[in-house]
From Swiss-Prot:
One of its GO terms (biological process) is positive regulation of induction of conjugation with cellular fusion. Putative transcription factor involved in the regulation of the activity of the cAMP/protein kinase A pathway. Involved in sterol uptake. With SUT1, positively regulates mating by repressing the expression of the mating inhibitors NCE102, PRR2 and RHO5 in response to pheromone. Belongs to the SUT1 family. Disruption phenotype: Leads to increased expression of NCE102 and PRR2, when SUT1 is also deleted. The lineage of its organism: Eukaryota, Fungi, Dikarya, Ascomycota, Saccharomycotina. It is found in: Nucleus. It comes from Saccharomyces cerevisiae (strain ATCC 204508 / S288c). One of its GO terms (molecular function) is zinc ion binding. InterPro entries: Zn2-C6_fun-type_DNA-bd_sf. Keywords: Nucleus, Transcription, Transcription regulation. This is Sterol uptake protein 2.
């Protein structure tokens, strides 16, 4: 391209923080010769559009056509590159939530009873996460039907393959105090006195301390049963359905060790 009386029109931006826009004349260049862009920009003086050229501009640009021009050297362009932004962000240190920081105004000693701003935000975020997060294991039958959160307590006190064929022939069996005393030396030597708070249940190869969920306890104080017909844990859900597929019309509470072996599982 070859410059031919190159002129430009200065379009002022409404936002004064932004640089002005320079538009070249429509008939400023011809394609007779090839010229590097760097050579084109070497001419620093520009003249405004002539009246005939202004007629070719859009209506909004015609407003600025009569204004004087300005040299390119007077225009300052801000550096908005990513590398420059990254360098500036690295210089700024922000305190982490719930952690000590160099900014003393953001941090106080939690152990003294005072609460930090960052600790409060962290606590709120943690509580929201807990409310939204689903239960780790299966829910009881009632809560699963109602599609509500089940808060039943399931504590695995002991897991031993010998338990499958011990204590009772049933795979799911609620122990009495006499059963605990009978097998205390073998399985319950370290079991604390929890009979008033938890049910002690033999469940497949586990001894489980179980407490019914709030929903089932309120629904029926007399016969409130919090039932887990698919098992207490996710691993149980792989065992009982397989037994049930071969033994129809038999619930988890009626299955025996013989049913367990008939389904292809081994006791030891």
């Amino acid at each position: 391209m070859k410059p031919n009386n190159r002129t430009c029109d200065v379009i002022t931006n409404k936002d004064e923080s932004l640089p002005a826009l320079l538009l070249p004349a429509l008939n400023s260049y011809t394609c007779d010769d090839s010229l590097l862009k760097g050579q084109i920009s070497s001419n620093g003086r520009y003249q405004p559009f002539g009246f005939s050229d202004c007629s070719l501009l859009p209506k909004r640009l015609n407003i600025q056509a009569g204004q004087g021009s300005m040299p390119v050297s007077s225009i300052q362009c801000a550096d908005h590159s990513y590398s420059n932004w990254q360098k500036e962000s690295e210089k700024t240190k922000l305190p982490k939530l719930g952690c000590p920081t160099e900014y003393t105004e953001y941090y106080k000693t939690v152990s003294s009873g005072e609460t930090t701003d960052s600790a409060v935000v962290s606590s709120i975020a943690t509580n929201r996460l807990k409310r939204k997060r689903q239960r780790d294991g299966p829910s009881c039958d009632s809560c699963r039907i109602k599609k509500i959160k089940c808060n039943a307590t399931i504590i695995i006190f002991l897991q031993d393959r010998n338990l499958i064929s011990s204590i009772s022939s049933n795979l799911h069996y609620t122990l009495s105090q006499d059963d605990i005393n009978q097998f205390r030396m073998k399985f319950f030597r370290k079991l604390p006195d929890v009979m008033g708070t938890y049910e002690v249940i033999k469940h497949l190869d586990k001894i489980v301390l179980f407490k019914a969920c709030t929903s089932c306890s309120r629904r029926n104080q007399k016969n409130g049963k919090c039932l887990f017909s698919r098992g207490f844990t996710k691993s149980d859900m792989n065992v009982f359905p397989k037994i049930n597929s071969k033994l129809k019309d038999k619930s988890i509470f009626e299955m025996t060790v013989d049913d367990y072996v008939a389904a292809g599982f081994q006791t030891l």
